[in-house]
Every structure is written in structure tokens, then in C-alpha cells.
Amino acid sequence: VLLKKSALIVASALGLLAAPSAAVTQFAGNGHLYEFVATNLSWQDALAAAAAATPIAGYTAHLVTITSQGEDDFVKALTGSATFVWAAGTDEAIEGVWKWAAGPEAGQTFFLFDEGPVGYANWNAGEPNNVGSEDYLHFKANAGNWNDIFATFTSGGYVVEYSPSGSTIPEPASWAMLMGGLGLVGAALRRRSSRKIVAA
């Protein structure tokens, strides 16, 4: 009985430490799933936490990448009254070259400081301003537009985006299944060619 009570106390304490999150919600515009997690983290910690989110079958978790106005509006509505929320944009590698750091868009440039948008972008007026190592994208959920901010800033939350996985079968298993299937086809063809046809 004492062991059960101790386990219950530990489980309750861990539950209190868990960050509150909204329900996982699907955006009809792209079929992806989204989850807002309200917790104070740096951008790097949010990037890691999103990638480590509880798996959903057929989906891969990552920090949100916002690639359309519809997705932008959906994500902002999902975050409610949160003040600042992390997204996966960064120009840490090359100043002024904003790329997505996660998801299927990882490595894709979406904004060039000297030229403007290459893909979808929704910066506040005068942003990104690249002041003092502001290399990470967050947005003001209540105001709606994007801002660049420094690495040690702790935002009020982040959004996990669950993108459909390319395949639910790991690649090594795919090769094994392909080879096994080809072997079965070969065996069937050999058996078929070795059959004798008897005329009635």
C-alpha cells in the first residue's frame, strides 16, 4: 500500500511538471496536425522538445513551419492569448538568410534580408531587423506578425506540427520486404514453368 501511495505521489508530481498543451488539431489546408504547448523555453529547447513530442502514428513531430497565410492564421488561432510563440525559422547559419530548421521544409530558405520573401513570410514592420544576434523566429500570437529574437529569450510556448510521414515502414524493412517479394515472384515463376501440362 505504501509503495502504491509513493508511486501515486510521484506520478502526480510529474503530472504537475508537465507543460500544459492544447488538443492536437488538424488543419484542413494541408492535413497536418498541430499542438500548442504553453511553456517558457528557449528556441533551441523548443526545437528539441517539439521533435521529441509524443509520436502519432503516420506523422513526424517538429517545431512548426508556417508556409501559407491559411496555416499562419490557423496556428495563431490555436495559440490563443499566448504572448510569444516559437516557430522553426532561423538565420543563425548565415545572417539574413532565413531558413526552416525542422520538418519537411528543413533547410529551405523562406526570406532573404536584402531581397525579401522567397516563400511565405509575415514579419512585423521593420522585421527582421537582425539586431544583436536576433537569429530565431517567434510570433506575437495576439498581434499576429513575426519577429526575430535572440537565443536566450524564453517564449511563452511553441507549436508542434505533425507532418505526414513519407512512409510508415522504416527503410531497412522496405528493402527486406522488396527482396522477399521478388523472391516469392521468382519462386512462383519457377514453379509455373516447371509444371507439366497434361492434355486430356
Regions found by a protein language model. Give the residues of each.
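A general lysine-centric signal
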Residues: 4-5, 196
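N-terminal secretory signal peptides that target proteins for export/translocation
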Residues: 1-3, 200
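Residue-level micro-sites within transmembrane alpha helices that shape
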Residues: 3-4, 134, 170, 189-191
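C-terminal membrane-anchoring or membrane-association module
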Residues: 187-200
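Short, threonine-centered small-residue motifs that mark membrane-proximal processing/anchoring sites
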Residues: 7-25, 161-184, 188
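Extracellular, disulfide-bonded carbohydrate-recognition/adhesion ectodomains
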Residues: 22-168
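Compositionally biased, low-complexity repeat tracts
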Residues: 11, 27, 92, 103, ...
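Intrinsically disordered, low-complexity segments enriched in glycine/proline and serine/threonine
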Residues: 7-8, 74, 199
